[in-house]
């Protein structure tokens, strides 16, 4: 009998929220099995990344270039797969204003949208996160806090 050793995959994603419009940044994926779906900035943690958030900072730089100052970072959720080998940290990144991202080859478009009008089709994991009742409540409370 062969023994299989699974390596844990740790990844992070960031949902930019612009305070001035209360809209979120979505990116149109260009590659792989999720090409043609709308997602958020993010990706896998690499060996050089010391934390899941450090991985997100690197992914932000790679995928959307220079961004406005992130005023606050709020953890939204930690998704764990059923087999407990995939962990996805999702953060809300609050910025003052919307910006025009400098997209790399992983994405072919972007859209700033409110949470009642998502771009379609939405990446399955992002959709699961945004339709989760607990996460929706957290986001609504966040809107109350930022005004």
Task: For the regions a language model picked out, list residue spans one by one.
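Active-site-adjacent beta-strand/loop module that shapes the phosphate/pyrophosphate-binding cleft
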Residues: 9-10, 20-22, 77-117, 133, ...
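Active-site micro-motifs of SAM-dependent methyltransferase domains
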Residues: 62, 109, 120
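A short coil-to-beta-strand element that immediately follows conserved catalytic motifs
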Residues: 67-78
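Active-site or metal-binding loop neighborhoods of secreted/extracellular toxin and effector enzymes
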Residues: 123-143
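Conserved N-terminal beta-strand and adjoining loop/helix that marks the start
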Residues: 1-25
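Conserved Nudix-box catalytic region and its N-terminal flanking loop in Nudix hydrolases
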Residues: 22-66
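Short strand-loop junctions, especially beta-strand C-caps/beta-turns
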Residues: 43, 115-116, 121
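Catalytic phosphate/metal-binding cores of nucleic-acid and nucleotide-processing enzymes, i.e., regions
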Residues: 4-5, 18, 37, 55, ...
